[in-house]
């Protein structure tokens, strides 16, 4: 009788094992498209056999635990490479926008406006007494000044957009770290019972990878299953159940940053002073946005300021000593910039010239009708070396900016594509290890179904044997 009971117990346990395996298969299939999900499997172990004399009678199998098929080294590698991809993607997008500012085909370009001004000065040298030609000079100069203003405005708008995106990313980071802290608690509570917290760990791993795409982080898992996450080298965002938000605040203008740029701060406690960790953020989307905003865009703004300042300085120095149509001198052509910084933003034709084109000087001598020597000097400024120790013209300086942004944008796009390929390969590798194959799961389902049927037949057989034994007792 005891052996029949044992056989029935083996069958019953086998039925339960098959049901568990089938349910796990169903869970895998249902999560085929769930991002970050790791395929799960039921680990079966041989049940403790029983001894009967010299015999060791097997007691079937039992489900020891449900584990996930996961490679933690690969997950960490994906997080690291994702950080590089986030950085490269942000830089590529931002540099693409800067490139559009200097796109000669779309905007005709500042180079075109610069050429028009010097062409107008040449026309003035051919007709030094003409008011119509002077009007053309004024309009060309005004259009050029507005082109400088436009480029400066578009570059600062790119910085403003970077600020907005940084603030948005920081809020997303805070939401993620809050969830990671909650998952830490769930993982610990579940695993205190000795049961692997598979789904919670999958979700936490996914959040860590997504977090790494936005900001460079370091994380480590403790023996209790909880992860500690730091950002910016010192800011502990998650430690066990606790979480600290990152903050965004406007900073005063300093060290090349314009006033009002957003910077990232960290508070260790509610009552502590916020610590600026902006300079420590070197990776992820925020790192890429900061690098372009604070370095690349500022470099191009400074380059445009240098060009606007030198243009106005050279033209004013020549124009102020010349004589206008009525023999007057001492007129500035452009409003004199206070300094190089902000010259492109504030460049404008002087009110004197805007109100009276007759005040545009063309002559080098007083009361000399037909004198075009000053107009020739003004038109010749196009070819005068005024940068790099007198070896580069205004055109050369501008073209160097255009060439540089093109090279930078191309390099950033290449970096993004290369990094995207690396991440893509790692994701494919992860999919081959941890991903769900529908064909494979269907094969397993059929196998477990057959096992279930066989187990049910075993239970029925044991039941029939028990019935036979009971009937013998009744006879």
Can you annotate each of these PLM segments?
Residues 1-475:
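S/T-rich, low-complexity, solvent-exposed segments of bacterial secretion/appendage proteins
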């Amino acid at each position: 009788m005891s052996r029949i009971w044992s056989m029935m117990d083996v069958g019953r346990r086998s039925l339960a094992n098959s049901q568990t395996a089938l349910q796990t298969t169903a869970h895998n299939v249902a999560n085929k498209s769930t991002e970050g999900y790791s395929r799960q499997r039921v680990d079966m172990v041989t049940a403790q056999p029983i001894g009967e004399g010299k015999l060791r009678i097997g007691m079937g199998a039992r489900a020891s635990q449900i584990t996930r098929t996961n490679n933690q080294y690969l997950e960490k590698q994906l997080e690291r490479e994702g950080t590089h991809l986030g950085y490269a993607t942000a830089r590529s997008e931002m540099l693409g926008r800067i490139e559009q500012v200097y796109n000669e085909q779309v905007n005709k370009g500042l180079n075109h406006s610069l050429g028009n001004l010097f062409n107008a000065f040449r026309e003035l040298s051919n007709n030094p007494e003409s008011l119509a030609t002077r009007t053309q000079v004024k309009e060309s100069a005004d259009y050029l000044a507005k082109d400088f203003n436009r480029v400066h405005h578009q570059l600062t708008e790119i910085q403003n957009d970077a600020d907005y995106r940084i603030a948005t990313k920081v809020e997303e980071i805070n939401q993620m770290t809050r969830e990671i802290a909650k998952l830490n608690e769930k993982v610990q509570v579940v695993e205190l019972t000795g049961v692997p917290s598979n789904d919670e760990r999958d979700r936490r791993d996914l959040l860590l990878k997504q977090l790494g795409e936005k900001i460079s982080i370091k994380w480590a898992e403790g023996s209790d299953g909880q992860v500690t996450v730091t950002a910016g080298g010192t800011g502990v965002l998650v430690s066990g159940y606790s979480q600290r938000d990152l903050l965004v605040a406007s900073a005063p203008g300093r060290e090349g940053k314009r006033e009002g740029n957003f910077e990232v701060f960290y508070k260790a406690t509610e009552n502590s002073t916020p610590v600026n960790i902006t300079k420590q953020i070197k990776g992820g989307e925020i790192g890429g946005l900061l690098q372009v905003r604070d370095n690349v865009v500022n470099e191009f703004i400074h380059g445009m300021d240098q060009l606007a300042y030198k243009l106005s300085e050279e033209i004013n120095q020549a124009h102020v000593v010349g004589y206008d149509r009525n023999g007057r001198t001492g007129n500035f052509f452009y409003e004199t910039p206070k300094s190089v910084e902000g010259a492109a933003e504030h460049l404008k034709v002087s009110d004197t010239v805007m109100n009276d084109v007759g005040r545009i000087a063309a002559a080098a001598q007083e009361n000399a009708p037909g004198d075009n020597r000053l107009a020739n000097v003004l038109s010749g400024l196009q070819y005068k070396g005024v940068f790099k120790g007198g070896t580069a013209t205004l055109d050369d300086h501008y073209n160097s900016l255009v060439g540089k942004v093109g090279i930078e944008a191309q390099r950033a796009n290449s970096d993004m594509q290369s990094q995207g390929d690396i991440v893509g390969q790692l994701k494919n590798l992860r999919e081959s290890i941890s991903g769900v194959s529908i064909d494979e799961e269907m094969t397993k389902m059929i196998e477990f179904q057959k096992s279930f049927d066989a187990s049910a037949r075993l239970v029925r057989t044991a039941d029939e044997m028990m019935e036979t034994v009971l009937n013998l007792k009744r006879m």
